[in-house]
Amino acid sequence: MLLEVEKINTFYGLSHILFDVSLNIDKGEVVVLLGRNGAGKTTTLLSIMGLNAPKTGAIRYQGQEVMGLASYKIARMGIGFVPEDRLIFPDLTVYANLDVGRKSLNGRKSKWTFDRIYKLFPVLKDFSDKPGGDLSGGQRQMLTIARTLMGDPDLLLLDEPTEGLAPLIVKMLADFIQVIKQEGMTVLLCEQNLKFALKHADRAYIVDNGIIKYQGTIAELNQNTEIKKKYLAV
């Protein structure tokens, strides 16, 4: 098992957000965490990444306990996080933004080179000398993902990657997920675009009010109209 999340309880101040949340991901899987706005999807990713550490429970990555570690240490272990708000350095060029991701390796070699990134996201090559702040929302999303890849993660956490993007950009992100899936990269995806999620994931969890209400394969979820209607408003 690549990632094991076991009965974590996460709080924002005194507010209890996640209740005994458990999930697991095998190497090479694409797993989607579904749920309405405010259900606890993003908090789950923040908990895994150490950005909002749970009070109780356990999080193991490749068999090692990571709960309580600083987020940069978790990243160095091989977990990459792409947040929903597409954080980039707007005053740095696209190239320099990517270089920030590469420098996080601390001298280790990455299978993700500039050439490979530019092949995957050609628009970043076209704008490599432009400030990141000049990019559109979709281009910033590509840059955020690409910069994370430069750190050579084995597990990629994607938080609402299609939110607010044009259909053409969503198609490019779909192609990207297929590429990294074929290469055996593991992905945990939080997504409200149900059509996108069901097309590209292997398994799904549904979270509602901070509680995991369902888990199963995509085929099983597709057949379960009651669950989709109850928790996903389908």
Label for each model-derived stretch:
Residues 13, 54, 92-112, 120-125, ...:
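ABC-type ATPase nucleotide-binding domains, specifically the catalytic core motifs of the NBD
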Residues 49:
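Helix-to-loop junction immediately C-terminal to a conserved catalytic motif
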Residues 57-66, 77, 110-114:
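Conserved ABC transporter NBD signature motif
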Residues 131-135:
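Conserved ABC ATPase signature
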Residues 156-160:
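Catalytic Walker B motif of ABC-type/P-loop ATPase nucleotide-binding domains
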